């Protein structure tokens, strides 16, 4: 039978490792800790000072930027809203004579006042977007067609009203006629998409397409 080594007896026969005095070990550790503390204490204080300086500078800058006068200027720039979205007034005869409004107008849309040139650009861009909507028309997408039409036509409606007001006297009536023809067609197109009549939607869109091209030519 094989003999197994007694681990306890083997451990007892090994020479014991010498132990350092406790005082020397403690002194070495504490000395090292003190040196490490001295090395990092100064950078921490410098870092804190820098942060305080930076924070103070930022607070001064924000005080100057967000002062009462500057807030007042921001409120008057046409982009600052501190209440419900305003409904722009209509100054020209571009509403439906029977309803006094337009069925496609979407509520809750903020139409920023970006000046006459900005409105002309926005009219041209929205007309271009509606021309690109032709690829969206399909049997399963008429709901999206209606939503997209309402969003774009709302901007067109309010922008046209302001452009008519800013136009020369000889241009007011031609712009009004173009706007009414376009918006009458928008209402027909919206109704066809709402009733999910694909054939009627496609037919109305063909007429709308020519009017949109005329709008882009007029705003070029």
Swiss-Prot record:
Primary site of residence: plastid
Gene Ontology cellular-component annotations: chloroplast; chloroplast thylakoid; chloroplast thylakoid membrane; cytosol; extrinsic component of membrane; nitrite reductase complex [NAD(P)H]; photosystem II oxygen evolving complex
The keyword Cell division appears for this protein: no
Keywords: Chloroplast, Membrane, Plastid, Thylakoid, Transit peptide, Transport
Alphabetized Pfam families for the sequence: PsbQ (PF05757)
UniProt membrane topology term: Peripheral membrane protein
Transit peptide feature range: 1-35, 36-77
GO BP: photosynthesis, light reaction; photosynthetic electron transport chain
GO molecular function annotation: calcium ion binding; electron transporter, transferring electrons within the cyclic electron transport pathway of photosynthesis activity
Signal peptide as annotated in the record: none
Gene3D superfamilies (alphabetical): Oxygen-evolving enhancer protein 3 (PsbQ), four-helix up-down bundle
Recorded family membership: Belongs to the PsbQ family.
PANTHER family: OXYGEN-EVOLVING ENHANCER PROTEIN 3-1, CHLOROPLASTIC, PHOTOSYNTHETIC NDH SUBUNIT OF LUMENAL LOCATION 3, CHLOROPLASTIC
Function in brief: NDH shuttles electrons from NAD(P)H:plastoquinone, via FMN and iron-sulfur (Fe-S) centers, to quinones in the photosynthetic chain and possibly in a chloroplast respiratory chain. The immediate electron acceptor for the enzyme in this species is believed to be plastoquinone. Couples the redox reaction to proton translocation, and thus conserves the redox energy in a proton gradient. Required for both formation and activity of the chloroplast NAD(P)H dehydrogenase (NDH) complex.
Subunit structure: Part of the chloroplast NDH complex, composed of a mixture of chloroplast and nucleus encoded subunits. Component of the NDH lumenal subcomplex, at least composed of PnsL1, PnsL2, PnsL3, PnsL4 and PnsL5.
This protein's name: Photosynthetic NDH subunit of lumenal location 3, chloroplastic
Organism from which the protein derives: Arabidopsis thaliana (Mouse-ear cress)
């Amino acid at each position: 039978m094989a003999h197994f080594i007694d681990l306890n007896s083997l451990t007892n026969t090994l020479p014991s490792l010498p132990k350092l005095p406790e005082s020397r070990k403690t002194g070495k550790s504490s000395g090292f800790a003190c040196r490490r503390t001295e090395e990092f204490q100064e950078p921490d204080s410098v870092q804190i000072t820098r942060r305080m300086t930076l924070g103070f500078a930022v607070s001064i800058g924000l005080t100057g930027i967000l002062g009462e006068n500057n807030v007042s200027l921001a409120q008057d720039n046409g982009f600052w809203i501190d209440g419900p979205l305003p409904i722009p007034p209509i100054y020209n005869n571009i509403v439906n004579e029977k309803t006094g409004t337009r069925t496609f107008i979407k509520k809750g849309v903020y139409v920023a006042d970006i000046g006459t040139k900005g409105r002309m650009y926005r009219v041209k861009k929205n007309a271009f977007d509606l021309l690109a909507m032709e690829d969206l028309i399909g049997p399963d997408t008429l709901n999206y067609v209606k939503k997209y039409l309402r969003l774009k036509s709302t901007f067109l409606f309010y922008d046209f009203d302001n452009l008519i007001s800013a136009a020369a006297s000889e241009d007011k009536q031609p712009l009004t006629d173009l706007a009414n023809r376009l918006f009458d067609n928008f209402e027909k197109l919206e109704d066809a998409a709402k009733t999910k009549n694909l054939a009627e939607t496609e037919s109305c869109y063909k007429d709308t397409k020519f009017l949109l091209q005329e709008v882009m030519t007029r705003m070029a």
